[in-house]
Structures are given as C-alpha cells and as structure tokens.
Amino acid sequence: MEEYKYVGKRLPRYDGMQHVLAKTRYINDIRLPGMLYVKAWRSPVPSARILKVDVSKAESLPGVVKVITWKDVPYNRYGFVADYPVLAEDEVRYIGQEVVAVAAEDLDTAMEAVSLIDVELEEREPLLDPLKGMEPDSIQVSPEGNFVYFGDKPVRQIRKGDTDAAFAQADYIIENYFRTAAQEHCPIETQCGIAQTDVMGRTHVYSMSQAIWFNKMWLAPILKKPQSMVHIMGGVVGGGFGSKNDPHTDLICSVLSLYTENRPVKWLWTREEEFTSSTHRGSMHMFFKDGVMKDGRIIARQVRSIRDGGGYILTNDYVGAKHAYGVAGPYNIPNVKVDTYVILTNKRPVSSMRGFGLYQASFADEVQIEKIAKTIGMDSWKIRFINAVRDGDTSSTQAELHSCALIEVMQAAAQRAGIKLDDDLLTMSSKVRLEV
C-alpha cells in the first residue's frame, strides 16, 4: 500500500501550540496608543420611524471624542445590493439596529454617552412571520417589498422533467412540512474591530473578518475612497461559522476613525449584543411532495421553501439559491420542481452560516426519506441505495454528475456502524446503475 505523507495521518494543528500556551493574539488583544472605545445606541423595538435624534448631551460629556449619525457617513449603504445602512436613517427594521455610534476615551464614558442620546421613535406593527409577509396586504418591511429577488424574479425556481405527469404515475404521494429554527453562531470571541485613519488619509482596519475582501469592497465606497486607501489586516478568528463574513464592527469603527484625528477606535461587542444584533441562520419553512413507486424509486419531487430573511438582504439571495439546488439531495430524481422564496421581516438580518441553506435542505430531505420508508414499508437504507446518484446521472439543475461515491460511502459507514446490509446493496456501485 502506498505510504502517504498526510492522508490517513494525525497531524498537529499549525496553530495548536499557540492556543494551548495562551499565546494566540486575537483582535481584542491589540492595544494601540491613544485608543478610543465605541458603543452604539441601538433600537429597542423591531420596527419604527425615527422622528428625532438629539446627541447634544452625549457630545458635551467629558471624554467623548466623537458622536456620529448616518449624516456623518460618507456613503451610508452596503451589501451586495447596497440596501443596508451603516447607521439607520429614517427607520429601524429590527431590535438592536445601530442608530448612533460614540467614540470615547474609555468604555464607561462611551456607555454613559449612549444613555444620554435622545431618539424619538414612532413604533410600527412589525412583520415577524415570513408566511404572512407573502400575502398581498402584508406589512411591507422594505419600500421595494418583502420579496428578495433572484435576478428579475421574486423566487428561485428549478424545473426538471414533468412533475405533474410523474405524480399521476406514482404509486404513493407523500407530503410533509418541515421547519428549521433560527440559530445563533455563538462564537467564543464576540465581534471586535479596530480602525485608524492616518495622516495620509489611509484607513487601516484590524479585522476578525472571515471575508476580508468583502469588507474592503464595501468599506471603500462607504468612506468614498479608492480601495488602495483601505488597508485591512486579518487576525485570528475566534470562532466564526459564517457570522464573521459580515462587517459588524469594521464599518462603524472606520467611519468614526475619519473624525478622531488619527486616533484608533475599537469596538468589542458584549455577549448580549452578539445574540441580539449579529447576523444568524434564518428559520425556514419547507413543504415537500414526493411521488414514489412501490419499488422505492422517487420519481418526482416538488418543494416550496420560504426563508425568513430578516431586515436586509445581505447574502439572502445566495443562500436561497443554494438551498434550491440542494433540496433534491444526493438522489437521482428525474422530475423536480422547486420554488424558493426569501421574505424580509422585522428581525435581525440573517446571513451565512455553515452550509448556506444546504443544512435545511439536507435535514428535510433525509427526514422525508425516513417517512417514505415508513409509508411504503421498505428499509430506509435500501431507499437511499436505490435512489443514490451514479456517474452519468443529472442533478436537479440538469448538470451531468461524475466521480459519485455515495453508495461506497454508505457501504463503508454501515460496516463501521455494525449494520448488516442486504447482499444486493453490497453489490451496488456508483459507477453503474443496476435494475432494481
């Protein structure tokens, strides 16, 4: 057997020794001369018009260096479709949305300054249910409506084959509803960022970001500077899982640094802020309908999914599209119809988290397999083997598949788990499809 250098070997983590010796340097460990500290006034309600913002008392507090509102942000929009304000302007869309930011000599002063800010809100009825958000007379979260668009359509559609004809042919029609809950990433290290603008006007950012180039792409227009004048230095990420793809602290710190006469500003979120204001995995509703033959073949699948998109778009369209691609699972289903919607609500924004929509699809898909097995009286392992993709099959998007290995992986998993498979399953291969 060929000896490999890495494959099959237990290798030490390159950063393991630094971690166990407590020598790893995180963004919060950075101390710079003249450091200022940031806190923000956040919305206490999920939906409201902003009638008045008075920061005069906060500005006059000794130790406060700068207080900013949206009027101080050179360009107050970011995101892939630039719908998200750095600081809220005339409305708030979720509890915890930043309206005013303060930079002060110390954290206590920054917190006191926030308590002196007077914001008058006209509270509105919030939209909290994405299913209700699809109704014609629903509360509108955005002036453009509640539907997140995929190109020029408010739905991501996938069509393969003729599902209506296949359902008419099927021996069983099996329908189920699945719902996955919202989920917080809970990184051990909460959001943290440091920014400093030097005498040449170049803004330097110490970032824990998982997506530094996204930050750079968004920061340059926000600051109205070329990208060459935005310098982002990545650090060790103390747990991210997708939450640190979004620039929770970097944008506001960078804007504040424009006004602090070259002094660095730092913002470390509390655990409460992490829970209430960071992006998270949104909940999803999934309606599955499968057409199944007595021999276990799934010949048709129809899925309607609705994702709770939170207050702004961010990566919602991408996550919705990936979810749509994934609802057929690793199975060869000849007829597929998928409609995936993302609906804005008055909740904190949702964004990337491990799997980008595929986790929800896989959960529903595999539970559906178990329910099919129970309905038709067949072992669920056998159903998975019968329907597993083979080389030459096509995906739900009609891409031809190669290098398939699901059958071999299931055979190995069963062996390791001590599960005895029938002989006909052990002779199956991902390279050739045998008659059932």
Regions found by a protein language model. Give the residues of each.
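Structural alpha/beta core scaffold segments of enzyme domains
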Residues: 1-436
